Amino acid sequence: MPPKVKFSKEEIIHTAVELTREQGFDAITARDVGARLGTSSKPVYTAFASMQELKHAVIEQAYARYQQLEQQTVSEGKYPPYKSMGMAYIRFAQEEPNLFRLLFMRDRTGEADTDYGYQDAVQMVQTQTGLDQDSASLFHTEIWIAVHGIAVMFATAYLDWDMELVSRMLTDFYQGLKSRQIAE
């Protein structure tokens, strides 16, 4: 007979996500997750075939939190949709630095490419600017590099700018690139 389940997969994932939020992804060990649950590591291995499986579930949950923040930011309507995506990315880095590091600053060697909404963003740029696919892709990549740089500075506590200043900068990046594209 299999061991009795003391904690659900969801409880274990939630605990592992909270550990990641507080201490970073490296803090996820079966022993530490078990200790946080007030037990041994055994329930972790009962619920998951391996730590890799649990870590994959934590990444999925972190991405779901990011998507939720992005959707919330877009639906608030404070910024145009494309800008909202950048503002949400930076806000996620500011509010959830360890989850941001997990999703967007970890070594990807050996991992499959993840789109993370790239094609949707390129389509949005095409619609807003009238650029062809290749030009819109370059445009978005250049914007994303600037947004990612600001987000990394927030996630690493290098700076803590006011979000209105960040908004102004994103507008400047967008308008500058758009002006250059039109001139070409």
What is each of the regions a protein language model found here?
Residues 12-20, 62, 66, 89, ...:
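Short hydrophobic clusters on alpha-helical segments that form packing/core surfaces
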Residues 104-142, 167-176:
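Amphipathic alpha-helical packing segments from all-alpha helical-bundle domains
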Residues 71-98, 133, 143:
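Hydrophobic alpha-helical connector segments
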Residues 11, 15, 19-53, 57:
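Helix-turn-helix
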Residues 95, 99-105, 145-162, 175-184:
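Amphipathic C-terminal alpha-helical segment
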Residues 20, 53-62, 103, 107, ...:
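Alpha-helical DNA-contacting segments of helix-turn-helix folds
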Residues 56, 60-84, 121-128:
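Amphipathic alpha-helical linker/stalk segments
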